[in-house]
Amino acid sequence: MKTPIELKILDSRIGTEFPLPAYATPGSAGMDLRAITDTQLVIQPGETVLIPTGIAIHVADPSLAAIILPRSGLGHKHGIVLGNLVGLIDSDYQGPLMVSCWNRGSEPFTIEIGDRLAQLVFVPVVQAEFKLVDEFNQSDRGTGGFGHSGTK
């Protein structure tokens, strides 16, 4: 069963010239987000740009969130990654979805109108409540810190 998520079209080209975000296969975890711009964009090496997707969503359910993740081919082949690494969309956010693209490569990269830029994935959320303690129960891991457990 699929969970309904409210989606607002902010650009009339969505649903006509460009499809609504959708799962490509029954096993897909993410839906592609597209660059819905008025002109092509050229991202220079080292530059970060914020690109509209033409949609807004309202997750509404506090036990869910949406995350925006990079498309693997753009990062690996062209050095195009998300400027914020991962975009977190809280359940109560209702504004436009934007994709921050960073060119970490050495060549300018052109984004055409409608290019697929990133993936939108919905994930479960557990809201925690802190319990103050003076000491933790000891664990095998302890307080070794970053990299303490090694690679083997």
Curated annotation (Swiss-Prot):
GO MF terms held by the record: dUTP diphosphatase activity; magnesium ion binding
Binding site for substrate: R71, S72, G73, N84, L88, I89, D90, M98
Annotated EC: 3.6.1.23
Xref: InterPro entries: dUTPase, dUTPase-like, dUTPase-like_sf, dUTPase_trimeric
Cofactors: Mg(2+)
Disulfide linkage: none
Catalytic activity: dUTP + H2O = dUMP + diphosphate + H(+)
Pathway, per record: Pyrimidine metabolism; dUMP biosynthesis; dUMP from dCTP (dUTP route): step 2/2
Top-level taxon of origin: Bacteria
GO biological process: dUMP biosynthetic process; dUTP catabolic process
Keywords: Hydrolase, Magnesium, Metal-binding, Nucleotide metabolism
Enzyme class: hydrolase
Functional summary from the UniProt entry: This enzyme is involved in nucleotide metabolism: it produces dUMP, the immediate precursor of thymidine nucleotides and it decreases the intracellular concentration of dUTP so that uracil cannot be incorporated into DNA.
Assigned protein family: Belongs to the dUTPase family.
Protein's UniProt name: Deoxyuridine 5'-triphosphate nucleotidohydrolase
Gene behind this protein: dut
